[in-house]
A protein has these predicted regions:
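Conserved C-terminal beta-signal and adjacent last beta-strands/turns
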Residues: 8-10, 21, 192, 245-250, ...
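Short, acidic, small-residue-rich periplasmic hinge/interaction motif at the N-terminus
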Residues: 22-58, 95
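N-terminal periplasmic accessory domains that precede
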Residues: 33, 65-68, 86-89, 101, ...
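Extracytoplasmic beta-strand/coil segments of soluble accessory domains associated
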Residues: 66-109
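Short acidic/polar hinge/loop motifs at secondary-structure boundaries
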Residues: 105-133, 463
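Periplasmic-side early beta-strands and strand-to-turn transitions of outer-membrane beta-barrels
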Residues: 182-283
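Membrane-embedded beta-barrel scaffold of Gram-negative outer-membrane proteins
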Residues: 301-319, 368, 436, 442-444, ...
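Gram-negative outer-membrane beta-barrel transporters
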Residues: 401-408, 498-503, 522-610
Length: 681
C-alpha cells in the first residue's frame, strides 16, 4: 500500500509541476564566498568545531537530533531502536563524556550523566554545533569527548506568520508540526509544537530465533529465521516551545525560552523474548519543563550576558509481566524527580588585539529517585532509593590574542565545584595560524586537561552506588589542518583533518559484585586516539542547478590500558564495548528550480558488546551501511508556499543492529505536506 502511494505521489508531483510551470519560482542558487581566515572570530581561535547547517535541522519534522547527527557528523550515535534511547559519543568515549547545553543550560541528566537525543526534535533547534575534544573546555567542563551546543534564535518574523507540516509514514506513523510567529521592530514571538505517534510495529527477521521445519512424521528437515513484528514499541511524544524576545534597539535584548515535553513510550521487547506482547507492559513516561530567561547587553567593545533557568523532570518506568497465571505482576515501579535551578553570567571585553572573557555557571540539582518495588533496610529505616541535592559550579577565564591576521593564541582556565569537592585547575591552550593564504590553509593545535565527576546514580543508586568513587581525569591533544577554496557563485570546496590523542584515568565502569548486583568502580585507564576528516563541496552546475556534497570520516581506536582486574580479565588492550573503530557519512543534495533530491549514507564498523572483544555471535555487532533518500517539490501559490516531500529510509532494506537484541526497521516510507500562508504578501 505504501509503495503504491509513493508511485501515486510521484505522478502527482510531476503533474503539479506542469500545471504550476507558469508560476514556478526558482530557488536562489547561492555559493558561499570563501571565508578569509584573517576575518575569523577571535572566539574560535584554535577551536575544532562542526556546525550543523540550518537546512539539515529543518530537513523533515520526524527527525530527532539523533537522526541529524548520525548522518551529518563524525560522532557515534547509539540507538536502542526507533523512538527509543539514543545517545552520542565523541572520539571513542562514552555518552556520559558528552556535555550538552541548550541555550547555555546543561541538559545532561544529573542521575545518568547523558542526554537522550531522540527526545530533541530537530525542528526545535535553530543552531547546533559540536565542540570536539579540548574545544569543549570553552563551553563547559566534564566533556572528555566533547560537547554539543544547541540553541534557538529569534524567528526574524515581519508581522504574523504560520507554518504547518503534516507527516504520514510506515507503521501508521503520524508527525505534525505547527509554528506561529509574530515580529516587529522590537518584538519576536514564536510558538512551536510537534506531536509524533506510532504503533511502531515494523517487521524484521529475527536472527536470534530459529523455527524448525518438520515433515509428516515430525522429523526436522530444515529451519529458518522467523519474520516477526516489533512488539511493545508504540510511542506518543508531544513537544511545545514558546519563545519571546524583546530588543530595545539600544544594545539590550531580553529573551524567554520555555520547552515542555510529554512523552509516553513503550520499551520494545528483545529479539530473545519468547513471550507474547500481551504478557508484558514495559513503559516509560516523562514530563519535562525547561525554561531559560536571558539578558544580553551589547556595546562596541564589551558584552555582558546573564541567564537564569529551571528544569523539572518527572519520569516513571513501569515493568509488569504475567508469570503464567493470567495476572500481571509489577516487577519494577521506578519514579524519579529532578529539579534544577540554573544561573549564568558571561562577560567579554575587546582591547585592540586581545579578547578577554569570564564566565560563571551554577546548576543546583535536587533529585529524588525511587523504585517502589525494592525496599532495603538501613537500620530501622526503609530505603527505596535516594533523595539528594548537589550544587555544580563552573567558572572560567580566557585571554585570546591575535598579534597578526595570520596567528592566534588562546588560553583558558576553568575551575569546577561539585558538591563540596573542587576539581584541580583545568587549563587549555589553543593556537592557530594561516600557513598559506593561497588555499586558505590553516593549522590548529590545542591541549587541555579535563575532569568529570561521578553522576548521582554512580554515587547513590540503590543497590550498588559507590560514594567513594573518584572523578575521571584526562588530558587531550589535538592537531589539525583545514583549507577552503572556491569562486563565489561558481563553487566552494573546504575540508579539514585532525589528529587527537586522549588519555583518561579512573574510568568509571559498572561491574557485577558477589552480592548479585552491579556497582561502579574506577577501574580503567583508557587511551583514545585517531583521525577525523571532514569535507564539503558546493557547485553551481548551471544557473538553476546546484550540487552539494558533504562527507565525514573518523578512525577512533579506544583501548583499555589499565591493569587486569583478575587472571580472567581479557579486556586489557581491547577496544571498548559499543565503540566503532570506523565511522563515515556522506550526504548529497541536487537542487533544480523547486525540486530537491537528497541522499544520505552512513557507516559504522563492527562493534563489540563485551570488554573482552569476544568473537561469538552475541559478542559483536556486524558492520552496517544505512541509505536514505528524499525527494521534495516546492510550489508558490498566490495564497501560500507549499512543499511535498517523500522520504525512503533504509533504502536497500538493510538488516542491522545498533544494540544487541534490539530490532531495527527495514525499508520504510514517509510523506510530508508543508503549508506556509502568505498573510502579508
Amino acid at each position: 500500500m505504501m509503495r503504491r502511494f509513493f508511485y501515486i505521489l510521484v505522478v502527482a508531483l510531476c503533474l503539479a509541476h506542469v500545471v504550476q510551470a507558469q508560476d514556478d519560482v526558482r530557488r536562489n542558487i547561492a555559493i558561499k564566498e570563501v571565508t578569509v581566515f584573517g576575518q575569523r572570530p577571535m572566539k574560535d581561535i584554535g577551536v575544532q568545531r562542526t556546525r550543523i547547517d540550518s537546512a539539515v535541522l529543518k530537513e523533515n519534522v520526524s527527525l530527532s537530533m539523533a537522526d541529524v547527527l548520525a548522518f551529518n557528523s563524525s560522532i557515534f550515535v547509539k540507538s536502542y531502536g526507533r523512538a527509543t534511547l539514543s545517545t552520542v559519543a565523541f572520539r571513542g568515549t562514552s555518552p556520559s563524556h558528552t556535555q550538552v547545553t541548550w541555550n547555555g543550560m546543561k541538559i545532561n541528566s544529573p542521575m545518568l550523566g547523558m542526554t537522550d537525543f531522540s527526545m530533541i526534535p530537530s525542528y526545535f533547534i535553530d543552531d547546533a554545533s559540536l565542540l570536539h575534544g579540548t574545544s569543549s573546555v570553552n563551553e563547559t567542563g566534564g566533556g572528555l569527548g566533547g560537547a554539543v551546543r544547541l540553541s534557538t534564535k529569534p524567528a526574524q518574523a515581519d508581522g504574523f506568520g504560520l507554518q504547518y507540516v503534516q507527516g504520514v509514514g510506515s507503521f501508521k506513523t503520524f508527525d505534525e508540526f505547527l509554528r506561529l510567529t509574530y515580529g516587529d521592530d522590537h518584538w519576536q514571538l514564536s510558538t512551536r509544537a510537534v506531536y509524533s505517534s506510532s504503533p511502531n510495529d515494523y517487521k524484521y527477521r529475527n536472527r536470534d530465533k530459529k523455527e524448525n521445519i518438520y515433515d509428516d512424521e515430525m522429523n526436522i528437515i530444515g529451519s529458518y529465521y522467523p519474520t516477526e513484528r516489533n512488539r511493545s514499541g508504540s510511542y506518543k511524544d508531544l513537544h511545545l516551545l514558546q519563545e519571546i524576545y524583546y530588543n530595545t534597539g539600544r544594545g539590550d535584548r531580553f529573551g524567554l525560552n520555555a520547552w515542555y515535553i510529554n512523552s509516553n513510550r513503550e520499551l520494545q521487547m528483545l529479539t530473545t523474548d519468547y513471550g507474547e506482547a500481551s504478557d508484558f507492559d514495559n513503559r516509560q513516561r516523562e514530563h519535562t519543563f525547561r525554561g531559560v530567561l536571558s539578558w544580553d547587553h551589547l556595546r562596541s567593545d564589551w558584552k555582558l550576558a546573564t541567564k537564569a533557568g529551571y528544569i523539572h523532570t518527572w519520569m516513571a518506568y513501569d515493568y509488569e509481566r504475567d508469570p503464567g497465571n493470567g495476572i500481571m505482576q509489577t516487577m519494577t515501579r521506578s519514579r524519579s524527580r529532578i529539579n534544577t535551578i540554573y544561573a549564568q553570567a558571561d562577560g567579554e571585553y575587546y582591547l585592540d588585539k586581545w579578547l578577554f572573557t569570564a564566565s560563571v555557571t551554577a546548576h543546583q540539582h535536587m533529585v529524588e529517585s525511587r523504585d517502589k518495588n525494592i525496599i532495603l533496610q538501613q537500620g530501622n529505616k526503609a530505603v527505596v532509593g535516594y533523595d539528594t541535592n548537589r550544587m555544580e559550579l563552573s567558572s572560567s577565564l580566557s585571554a585570546k590574542w591575535r598579534p597578526s591576521d595570520r596567528v592566534g593564541v588562546s588560553a583558558v582556565l576553568r575551575e569546577e565545584l561539585f558538591g563540596d569537592t573542587f576539581s584541580p585547575l583545568i587549563p587549555a591552550l589553543f593556537v592557530d595560524g594561516v600557513i598559506s593564504e593561497r588555499g586558505n590553509i590553516m593549522a590548529k593545535a590545542s591541549v587541555s586537561r579535563n575532569y568529570r565527576f561521578p553522576t548521582l546514580n554512580d554515587l547513590y543508586f540503590l543497590p550498588g552506588g559507590n560514594p567513594d568513587l573518584k572523578p575521571e581525569r584526562g588530558w587531550t591533544y589535538d592537531v589539525g589542518l583545514s583549507f577552503a577554496v572556491g569562486c563565489e557563485g561558481v563553487y566552494s570546496l573546504s575540508g579539514s583533518a585532525s589528529w587527537f590523542d586522549s588519555y583518561v584515568s579512573d574510568w568509571i565502569l559498572w561491574l557485577p559484585t558477589t552480592k548479585g548486583f552491579f556497582s561502579p568502580r574506577n577501574v580503567k585507564d583508557v587511551h583514545a586516539y585517531g583521525v577525523e576528516l571532514q569535507s564539503s563541496l558546493d557547485v553551481a552546475l548551471s544557473p538553476s542547478v546546484q550540487l552539494s556534497l558533504d562527507g565525514t570520516y573518523s578512525w577512533t581506536p579506544s583501548r583499555n590500558e589499565g591493569e587486569p582486574m583478575s587472571p580472567a580479565d581479557k579486556s586489557v588492550g581491547k577496544q571498548l564495548p559499543y565503540v566503532p573503530e570506523h565511522t563515515a557519512t556522506v550526504t548529497g543534495r541536487l537542487t533544480w528550480r523547486t525540486w530537491s533530491l537528497l541522499y544520505k549514507w552512513n557507516y559504522y564498523s563492527e562493534r563489540y558488546t563485551m570488554s573482552s572483544n569476544d568473537l561469538s555471535l552475541s559478542g559483536r555487532l556486524p558492520t552496517y551501511y544505512m541509505n536514505n533518500i528524499t525527494l521534495e517539490k516546492g510550489f508558490s501559490l498566490p495564497w501560500a508556499d507549499l512543499s511535498l516531500k517523500c522520504a525512503i529510509n533504509n533504502l536497500f532494506d538493510e538488516e542491522y543492529l545498533s544494540v544487541l537484541s534490539r530490532p531495527m526497521p527495514g525499508i520504510n516510507y514517509e510523506f510530508f505536506l508543508g503549508i506556509t500562508p502568505k498573510w502579508k504578501r
